[in-house]
């Protein structure tokens, strides 16, 4: 069984990944509120070992998308990262078609708070970064759902199943570090 561990660094820049990790900046097409799709950019680090670890960092979203940083966006980012890893051949084996979930699981953790940290100069793209001390963690089985294509790319979607949750929603409701990305259990 291969386990996936997705975690977010709280205070360090992911441009310098921890030792043994590989840095990725990838664009992803995601549904936006009210219909249509929006291209966002996600920074993350990957360590390929018996447990595959991913640290999600900054998220760059064009302001015209009207797309909030939210628990559902983090969920979609995690699924897209796992799908990209299967396409790249990072994952040794095949994720089973749904509803079967044997063999692969994900440990998906990330900062439960994000904050707006600026606009990329010369663009309308906003950058959001993890902040604060709390983490959101869920452990799920994985399967690929070829009958449920991604609404923006048409690719098969990864589904999370039988999830157990730990971690806390963002505790802050004031100040800049207050965007909640964690769904409470």
Summary of predicted features, one role per range:
Residues 7-19, 51-52, 156, 174-175, ...:
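Extracellular Ser/Thr- and Pro-rich, acidic-biased low-complexity repeat/linker "stalks"
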Residues 10, 26, 32, 47, ...:
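Surface-exposed charge patches in extracellular/virion surface proteins
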Residues 48-104:
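Structured domain cores in non-transmembrane regions
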